[in-house]
């Protein structure tokens, strides 16, 4: 999948060290927790794609599909290395994946669930067209062991701006 500045592609063996290093960066670890060895090889929730910028691993984006025809939805999540943040690459990566999931995979509803305190991520998702649905209290355990709230956000295919 191609964007104007990036490509989303499958994970290759040579990507694992770079992805592991990104997951260990303080600004990524804050929201994703400590990297687990199998997270990058076999994520437990869907397909993992590398965010590739001119051959460099900038981060990863993953999605999990609900293929039941009564639902046709998918959840998305991503992480971007600290040195790649603030350039609109997260927004572009989410937009590329949204287009694929709606136009190629036929999903009618997409969700994402950033931490309520992750304002940068929330702005990114809103810029793509995700809307706030509600707060999920004590949704996820933070790296320091405390619980934090998550924000459920959704994007519906019929309201998406292509």
Regions found by a protein language model. Give the residues of each.
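Conserved N-terminal entry element of GNAT/NAT acetyltransferase domains
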Residues: 1-14, 30, 151, 155-162
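Short glycine/proline-centered loop/turn elements that form peptide/ligand docking sites
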Residues: 90, 94, 118-121, 138-143
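Conserved acetyl-CoA-binding loop-helix of GNAT-fold acetyltransferases
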Residues: 86-100, 122-127
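Conserved active-site tyrosine of GNAT-family acetyltransferases
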Residues: 125, 130, 153
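Acetyl-CoA-dependent GNAT
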Residues: 10, 30-85, 91, 100, ...
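Hydrophobic pocket/interface hotspot
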Residues: 18-19, 76
């Amino acid at each position: 999948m191609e964007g104007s500045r990036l490509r989303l592609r499958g994970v290759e063996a040579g990507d694992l060290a770079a992805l592991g290093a990104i997951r260990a960066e303080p600004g990524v670890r804050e929201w994703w927790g400590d990297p687990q060895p199998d997270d990058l090889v076999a994520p437990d929730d869907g397909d993992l794609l590398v965010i590739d910028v001119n051959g460099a691993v900038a981060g990863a984006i993953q999605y999990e599909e609900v293929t039941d025809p009564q639902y046709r939805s998918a959840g998305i999540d991503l992480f971007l290395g600290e040195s790649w943040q603030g350039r609109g690459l997260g927004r572009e990566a989410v937009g590329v994946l949204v287009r694929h999931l709606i136009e190629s995979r036929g999903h009618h509803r997409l969700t994402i669930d950033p931490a309520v305190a992750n304002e940068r991520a929330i702005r990114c998702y809103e810029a793509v067209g995700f809307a706030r649905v509600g707060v999920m209290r004590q949704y996820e355990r933070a790296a320091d062991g405390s619980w934090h709230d998550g924000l459920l956000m959704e994007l519906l295919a019929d309201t998406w701006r292509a």
